[in-house]
Amino acid sequence: MPMINVQMFEGRTLEQRRKLVKELTDATCSALGVKPDSVQIVLTDVKKENWAEAGKLFSDT
């Protein structure tokens, strides 16, 4: 059973989330030859103040 974890900045709409999980599910089924009901996805919102790159918080850019 494929399990996909997606971490992204907060602020995406419910419609964007629906589209994302649909497309991730479709791609996973195509690539791995599994059925959609075996694909699990967890979406995690992260505030920019809790995410950094190259030693800088995204909230500081």
Regions found by a protein language model. Give the residues of each.
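A domain-level signal for the structural core that forms small-molecule/cofactor-binding pockets
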Residues: 2-61
